[in-house]
Amino acid sequence: DLHSFPTRRSSDLLVNILLDFGKPEKEDSIIKVIGVGGGGGNAVNHMYREGIHDVTFVLCNTDNQALNDSPVPVHLQLGKEGLGAGNKPEKARAAAEESLEDIKQMLSDGTRMAFITAGMGGGTGTGAAPVIARVSKEMGILTVGIVTIPFRFEGDRKIDQALDGVEEMAKHV
């Protein structure tokens, strides 16, 4: 089931959800918020700047420059190139598959719940977020996907690409 919340940004919804968790009793959080690609990265950067420190934020991207420009201290470059996916989900999917061990290691620190946020319709979020969700679920982590899809004016091709990504993501959350 896909639900849309037209009056609120997905990052604001996630901020409100996370604020309800309160402070953990220990320093290492069992909750990870993982931003994948440009859209997911923007959402995580926003939440991080809002001052939520009760979770561990992670950025995953095929674009090394986007990772370096972020204030979020934990990042994972997907693939070896670091030049982005060029709006090609299959390229991002391959980069994520190439980085499976790094993804597993990122999730292996006691993570019990993962929120994976991504913008669908481009390359990295659409292609890599489902791979990260699959790994998370295979590790027994409660995995929640929070994604956006393009506006109608962005065109049918981009929307179709986004819906393919949502369908793939839904298999793992």
Please annotate each region the language model reported.
Residues 4, 8-173:
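Tubulin/FtsZ superfamily GTPase core signature
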